Amino acid sequence: MKTTSFILALVLSTSLGKAQNAPQVSYFPLQNVKLLDSPFLQAQQTDLHYILALDPDRLLAPFLREAGLQPKAPSYTNWENTGLDGHIGGHYLSALSMMYAATGDTAVYNRLNYMLNELNRAQQTVGTGFIGGTPGSLQLWKDIKAGKIRAGGFDLNGKWVPLYNIHKTYAGLRDAYLYAGSDLARQMLIAFTDWMIDITSGLSDEQMQDMLRSEHGGLNETFADVAEITGDKKYLELARRFSHKLILDPLIKEEDKLTGMHANTQIPKVIGYKRIAEVSQDDKTWNHAAEWDHAARFFWNTVVNHRSVCIGGNSVREHFHPSDNFTSMLNDVQGPETCNTYNMLRLTKMLYQNSHNPNQTNEPDPNYVNYYERALYNHILASQEPDKGGFVYFTPMRPGHYRVYSQPETSMWCCVGSGLENHTKYGEFIYAYRKDTLYVNLFIPSQLT
C-alpha cells in the first residue's frame, strides 16, 4: 500500500467542476468534515449564532419591494437602505447553504428554504426571471437593455454597483443548489441567468466592456458555473462577454497594471477568468483557456508575492498601492480589506487544484497552500470577534491601532456579507486526496468521514 503523504494543501468543492487540465487533487464535500474543538469550531459556532440572529424578512424587504410586493418587515439600515439594498441577502443565501452543509443544522436549512421561497415569490411576480433589491431596478435594467449605459467605477446609470449587487444573489442561488441541494434554487438561478442573456443580447461587445467599468463582482464566474450545471454553452458565452478585457489583457501579457485600482473589484474578475478556463476545457471552438489560466496565475503571483503583507491581506483604503512602496500600509488606518482575502483564498483554491510543484512534477504546488494557510489563520480567522461574532472591514497594519467590528442590526458592509460566509466553510479545505494519497492540508482538529 502506498504510503500516505501529508503536505500542506487546500481544497475546493468537487461540485464546482473540473479544472483546465485533469485536477491534481480532489476534495471532500463539506458535510464529510466535522470540526473538533479549536478556535475554528468556536468561530463556526459563533457565526451560526450571528447568522440566525439576522431577520430574514428584513433581508428580503428590498427584493419584495422591487417586485411590487409588500415587505413583511422594514429593510435593515446602513448599506441595506442606501443603494446597495439586497447585497447581504445574497451573501446570506451562501452562508446558510454552507453552514447547513457543514453542520446539518435544521434551523439553518429551514431558514434557507424560507429565503428561497420568498425570493421565488418575488421572481415569479416580476415574471422576467429578475430578482434584485437595487432601488429602481426595473427601470434601470430597461435602460441597460436599450443601450443607455453610463458606467463609472462604483455606479451604473446613477445606481450603486447594481451588477456587483446582483452577483451576490447569483452566487447565493448557486450555493443553495450546490451545497444544500435545492432544486428550486437551481431553477431560479437558470431563470435569472436567462434574464441576463435577454438584457445583454442586443448590446455590442464595446457596450459590454463599457458597462464592465462598473464594479460587477464575479458574474463571469457564476455564469460559467451555470454553463457547467446545465451543460448549455450559451451560458459560457455569457460568462466570456462579462469578462473585463481592461484587466485581462495586461495579465495575459504578464503586465502588472494594478497600482491605484480598487482591489476587490479586480479579484473576482480573475476568479472568473480561471473558472471560464476550467469550463472551456472541452470547447474546441475557443482556444484561450490556457492563456486565461495563465493570466489568473500571474495575477495571483503578483498580488501574493509583491502586494501583500504578513497576514496575507492586501490594499490600503481598498486600493492597490505601489508594489515597491508600502509606506501607506504602515501609516493608514484603513489597511487590508477582509473581502479581498476572502476572494484571494477562493482564487488560491482554484489555482492549487491543477497546479504542479516545480520540484515534484506529480505533486501540486505547495506555494498556493503556504499562502492559503497564512491568510486563513492570520486574517480570516482573526477578522471575527470571537464572542459576539462581529466582522472586521479593515485590519490596519499601523502600529498600535485597532479594528472596528460590525453589529448585527446596524452594520451591513461588504465585509459583513463575505464575513458571514468565511466561518461556515473551514472544513472544506482541511483534506484533499488523489487516488490512494491523502493530503492533510490544514492542521485544524477535525474528523473526516
Which residues does each PLM region occupy?
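Glycan-recognition and catalytic cores of secretory/periplasmic carbohydrate-active enzymes
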Residues: Q20-T449
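Bacterial Sec-dependent N-terminal signal peptides
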Residues: M1-N21
